[in-house]
Curated annotation (Swiss-Prot):
Taxonomic lineage from the root: Eukaryota, Fungi, Dikarya, Ascomycota, Saccharomycotina
Native species: Kluyveromyces lactis (strain ATCC 8585 / CBS 2359 / DSM 70799 / NBRC 1267 / NRRL Y-1140 / WM37) (Yeast)
Entry's Gene Ontology molecular function annotations: 4 iron, 4 sulfur cluster binding; lipoate synthase activity; metal ion binding
Other notes: This protein may be expected to contain an N-terminal transit peptide but none has been predicted.
Cofactor(s) it depends on: [4Fe-4S] cluster
Protein name: Lipoyl synthase, mitochondrial
Length: 370
């Protein structure tokens, strides 16, 4: 026989069980997922049965993300000779000896043979990459190494960079950096110091810096603009609609526009410059709007080049744009009032043809002031 206390507990347990079993169960609906949304937008089972699935088209972002069959072989206009020549090997040895990094090597630029191997040393161009060879961001088009916490900046780098450039006897040099979101100033003071040391060792050298967005900190943009450089470059990379897919989430289209605008307002005589890749799935209307946005903030120079997939881990090419189309965009840029436009399948933001033109413009301005 059960004790009174145990009988009471047993009775309460049975009662609660009966109540729970008679109450209607409330089903909890799962939150709609991104995967479900994609399924709902796509063809149904009935569409597949009826053969209508092909009628569903992808928007530009989906096309850029999923394209795999349309583009296979590299067109003839994108094939380049193997890099060689005495100047090429001299620059390569100097870079290695002074423990410098170049975007030419790290980003696997197809123009390295042309830029480094010119017959005239004064026309050779190397884009020095400062603050190490490891970026804190992970853009889907870029082959530069990434890490959340790269090694600390090398304090001797500004001096070594200035020494290398003075050895090469260049008339024009480009400095660029990886993004360093781990640093409070984004590396702005390190880059500014490098510009100043170059100007001390070789006052006649024209200096272009291709910098990041400093997380939108416009005070750091001003530090760079006031460092003594001649050309302030910051790349838009792509059109606004594709920016979230192509670039790291910390880089935005409007933020990049604000960087170029701030640099121009800080030092109005600065030449401001940007670069846009084509072949990512952009439309003509989007490219034209990007150029209009850039002219609205006073950007002087723009370059267009073909996106080329560095490795299979990176986003795929949607389209190989023809040389004729690049000529079309150059004409449009000049019509909109850009000071200069370099546009071609192999053109990159630091392409030497553009630098030669800008060098002549800047030196012409200098002579006019004397």
């Amino acid at each position: 026989m059960l004790k009174p206390g145990i009988r009471s507990v047993q009775k309460r347990f049975i009662t609660e069980t009966v109540v729970r079993s008679t109450q209607p169960s409330v089903s909890r609906r799962r939150k709609t997922t991104h995967f479900t949304d994609k399924l709902n937008k796509g063809p149904s089972f009935e569409d597949f049965v009826n053969g209508n699935a092909q009628k569903f088209t992808l928007d530009p972002l989906e096309k850029a993300r999923q394209n795999s069959e349309e583009v296979q072989r590299l067109p003839t206009w994108l094939k380049v000779p193997i890099a060689k020549g005495s100047n090429f090997h001299k620059l390569k040895n100097d870079v290695k000896e002074l423990k410098l990094s170049t975007v030419c090597e790290e980003a696997k630029c197809p123009n390295i043979g042309e830029c480094w191997g010119g017959g005239d040393k004064s026309k050779a161009t190397a884009t020095i990459m400062l603050l190490g060879d490891t970026c804190t961001r992970g853009c889907r088009f870029c082959s530069v190494k990434t890490n959340r916490k790269p090694s600390a900046p090398d304090p001797t780098e500004p001096e070594n960079t200035a020494e290398a450039i003075s050895r090469w006897g260049l008339g024009y040099v480009v400095l660029t950096t990886v993004d360093r979101d781990d640093l409070v100033d984004g590396g702005a003071y390190h880059l500014a110091e490098t510009v100043q040391k170059i100007k001390q060792k070789a006052p006649n050298i024209l200096v272009e810096t291709l910098s990041g967005d400093f997380r939108g900190d416009l005070e750091m943009v001003k530090v760079m603009a006031l460092s003594g450089l001649d050309v302030y470059a910051h790349n838009m990379e792509t059109v606004e609609a594709l920016t979230p897919h192509v670039r790291d989430r910390r880089a935005t289209y409007r933020q990049s526009l604000s960087v170029l605008e701030c640099a121009k307002k800080t030092v109005p005589t600065l030449v401001t410059k940007t670069s846009v890749m084509l072949g990512l799935g952009e439309t003509d209307e989007q490219v034209l709007q990007t150029m209009k946005d850039l002219r609205a903030i006073g950007c002087d120079v723009i370059t267009f080049g073909q996106y080329m997939r560095p490795t299979k881990r990176h986003m795929k090419v949607v389209e190989y744009v023809t040389p004729e189309k690049f000529d079309y965009w150059k004409q449009k840029a000049l019509e909109l009032g850009f000071l200069y436009c370099a546009s071609g399948p192999l053109v990159r933001s630091s392409y030497k043809a553009g630098e030669s033109f800008i060098e002549n413009v800047l030196r012409g301005r200098s002579r006019a002031r004397i």
